[in-house]
């Protein structure tokens, strides 16, 4: 006899071997505002955890160091503002892996500058489960060398997150 997988099934007992979990996982956000200097890659102070299933995100170093090896889906979303300081020429979300720039979003405008930016970056990153880590960074270049503000009234606009992919 064969099973029709399109049917509905009612189980008693425990079903095993189905699904999986996407942990460790975390999400962190900025609490307030951070000022970034023009033409400088700066680590973001995303110091408020939304959740952290394995205490793998450090709110003082802004590092995610998972202790479970595998592939992770990582995201960085940034709300930035050039404060009317000549507007953005370049704005990049950046993820550093083990202290070096590894992933970067692309925003580079030769004309028609913007004062506000929303930079998003996602990457699938393999971690060794012991010492590998990622950190959130931002790079901005304004038309007249003015400072940039990250965060603001809705601090959930700037977030950093990751979760383990079920393999």
Where are these regions (language model features)?
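Extracellular jelly-roll beta-sandwich "head" domains, especially the C-terminal globular C1q domain
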Residues: 17-167
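Register-specific beta-strand positions within repetitive beta-rich fiber domains
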Residues: 1-19
């Amino acid at each position: 006899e064969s099973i029709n997988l399109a049917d509905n099934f009612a189980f008693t007992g425990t079903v095993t071997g189905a699904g999986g979990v996407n942990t460790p996982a975390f999400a962190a956000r900025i609490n307030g505002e951070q000022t970034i200097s023009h033409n400088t890659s700066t680590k973001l102070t995303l110091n408020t955890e939304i959740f952290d299933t394995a205490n793998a995100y450090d709110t003082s170093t802004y590092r995610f160091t998972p202790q479970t090896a595998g592939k992770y889906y990582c995201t960085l979303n940034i709300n930035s503002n050039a404060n009317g300081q000549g507007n953005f020429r370049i704005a990049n979300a950046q993820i550093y892996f083990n202290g070096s720039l590894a992933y970067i979003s692309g925003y580079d405008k030769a004309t028609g500058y913007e004062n506000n930016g929303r930079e998003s970056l996602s990457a699938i990153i393999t971690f060794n489960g012991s010492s590998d880590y990622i950190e959130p960074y931002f790079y901005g270049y304004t038309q007249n060398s003015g400072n940039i503000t990250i965060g603001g009234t809705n601090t959930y606009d700037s977030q950093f997150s990751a979760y383990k992919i079920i393999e």
